[in-house]
Amino acid sequence: MEIFFTSTLLVAIAEIGDKTMLLAILLATRFKKPVPVIAGIFTATIANHALAAWAGSTLASIFMSEAFRYAVATGFILMAAWTLVPDKVDDDINVASQRGAFVATTIAFFFVEMGDKTQVATIALGAQYHAVWAVAAGTTLGMMIANVPAVFLGEQLVAKISLRTVHKIAAALFLVLGLWQFWELSNPA
């Protein structure tokens, strides 16, 4: 359960103010159909994050060296710095609205999440924990915790949250994970 909760907390905080959260607001505003938008976010996220967690776990299994574990730890620390850089999403994102809210959201979310902070975090969590389903389920829940309120509250939510503070908290969590990994490497049991 620790892996699930760590993954959930880390991604829920990192997602606040992220470009995919801004995309959720944009799609909710454009379609005005919250249930299909939320279903599309869930479908895209579980597919994307299951692949990301699997990739991280597989890479870690192939490269079981200490150097790879140091690279993962360094990756968490770099994620801390990256989290402090605010995201933007173009208002001109071309969403195939003729396909309907669910399909358009699923496609848009899946591709916008590629290379995003939360996807990279999911890869790193998969590499660290080797628990694909716990990581994917946790990161997906984290995405839903951040994005479902964004779909319903949209701009009101963004206006009331200090994104700078949230980004600092997320950066601190990534930093702690990286330092913890380094500590585990230097103090083997």
Where are these regions (language model features)?
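Juxtamembrane transmembrane-helix termini in multi-pass membrane transport proteins
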Residues: M1-S61, A121-L141
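Structural signal for membrane-spanning alpha-helices in multi-pass inner-membrane proteins
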Residues: L10, A52, A80-T83, A108, ...
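Juxtamembrane boundary at the C-terminal end of a transmembrane helix
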Residues: W180-A189
